[in-house]
Regions:
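N-terminal leader/signal peptides at the extreme start of proteins
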Residues: 1-14
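N-terminal signal-anchor/signal peptide hydrophobic helix marking the start
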Residues: 14-24
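Residues within membrane-spanning alpha-helices of integral membrane proteins
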Residues: 24-25, 52
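C-terminal juxtamembrane segment of a hydrophobic transmembrane alpha-helix
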Residues: 26-45, 64
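Juxtamembrane membrane-water interface segments immediately C-terminal to a transmembrane helix
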Residues: 43, 47-54
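Extracellular/periplasmic head regions of type IV pilus-like filament subunits
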Residues: 58-123
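Short, surface-exposed interaction loops/tails
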Residues: 111-152
């Protein structure tokens, strides 16, 4: 009978510390994955914004080819829905909308010979976009503020 008590019993299973370490590692990995996923989503929305602005620019160029002027502004750098509705359906199927909570903006000179399209990005503005420290047709385009603008 003493032999039964004196032998070490081999325990099956994991200790509490081992379980806590594994749970902590899983938590850290999950956090890293979620942060990476959020960054990827932001970049995807920005790519969509850049594409939408380029599509608007193409539609404006087709409009210019037909009329010899770009769509003239009604007010200072309004949302595209204010005065670019004339592009639908002849030059594009529908006006694009920002995938987030912002909007796209359009400003033009009084004669319709120049314009600026503006979108607000979530990440840094790509190289080659138009930037100015002052308002261009009412649209302020500052790269530090993540404002992406293009002109013809």
């Amino acid at each position: 009978m003493l032999e039964i008590f004196s032998k070490k019993r081999r325990q099956k299973g994991f200790t509490l510390i081992e379980l806590l370490v594994v749970i902590a590692i899983i938590g850290i990995l999950a956090t890293i994955v979620l942060v990476s996923l959020n960054t990827a989503r932001q970049k995807a929305r920005d790519v969509r914004r850049l594409s939408d602005i380029r599509q608007l620019a193409l539609a404006l160029e087709m409009y210019y080819d037909d009329t010899n002027y770009y769509v003239k502004n009604i007010s200072t750098c309004p949302s595209i829905s204010t005065n670019l509705g004339v592009l639908v359906p002849t030059y594009m199927g529908a006006l694009p909308s920002d995938p987030g909570s912002n909007d796209y903006y359009y400003g033009s000179d009084a004669n319709g010979q120049d314009y600026v399209l503006r979108a607000i990005l979530e990440n840094a503005v790509p190289a080659g976009s138009y930037t100015s420290g002052t308002a261009t047709y009412g649209c302020v385009c500052v790269a530090a503020s993540k404002e992406y603008c293009i002109r013809p």
